[in-house]
């Protein structure tokens, strides 16, 4: 657990681990957190934007538009068929009060806070023995970024430019640092030396 007001950097999940976690959470009837992790990993949205989503925005559609809380910019998200199917499955199991309801509501009927989500994610990390040091809401966005980068490794500069735009970063250097690529490149330099 981190100290109050201290800063820790969220880590990303390996994509296959994230997908397995989404499936395990659903299998264990934890559809709310399964949906949270799926949306975070497949959209790259910040937690504040995920918590603001309502069912009518994401159910039975292949794309939706959000106005990002942090930047005020509009962003259109396309949902792939597997994610659409998972959203429908979660909707049927969660049984929200209506289509206008927020997607992530606590048992008390209020939208989860970021702090509560982070506590839940730490519990998930422990229960499912995730191999990740700092697992928080921001890990989902970083997992999205890392997967987009890894899928486009043959044209990594183009992938970084796309991610820079998606994340609303002012430079590719910021995106590289955000994804932890710079540190990895530095460490690989040491490995490339031979005796």
Q: What are the functions of these language-model segments?
A:
Residues 19, 82-132:
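Active-site/catalytic core of tyrosine-dependent DNA strand-transfer enzymes
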Residues 34-46, 63-64, 146-151:
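Short pre-functional
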Residues 131-151:
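Short basic/aromatic active-site micro-motif
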């Amino acid at each position: 657990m981190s100290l109050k007001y201290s800063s820790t950097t969220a880590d990303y999940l390996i994509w296959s681990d994230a997908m397995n976690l989404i499936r395990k959470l659903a299998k264990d009837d934890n559809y709310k957190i399964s949906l949270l992790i799926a949306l975070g990993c497949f959209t790259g949205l910040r937690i504040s934007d995920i918590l603001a989503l309502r069912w009518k925005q994401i159910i039975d559609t292949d794309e939706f538009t959000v106005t990002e809380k942090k930047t005020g910019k509009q962003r259109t998200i396309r949902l792939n068929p597997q994610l659409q199917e998972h959203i429908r499955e979660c909707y049927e199991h969660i049984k929200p009060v209506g289509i206008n309801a927020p997607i992530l509501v606590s048992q008390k009927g209020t939208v989860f806070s970021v702090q509560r989500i982070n506590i839940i994610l730490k519990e998930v990390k422990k229960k499912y023995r995730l191999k990740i040091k700092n697992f928080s809401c921001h890990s989902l966005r970083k997992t999205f970024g890392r997967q987009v980068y890894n899928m486009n490794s043959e044209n990594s500069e183009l992938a970084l430019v796309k991610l820079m735009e998606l994340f609303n970063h002012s430079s590719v250097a910021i995106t590289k640092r955000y994804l932890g690529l710079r540190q990895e490149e530095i460490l690989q330099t040491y490995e490339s030396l031979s005796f």
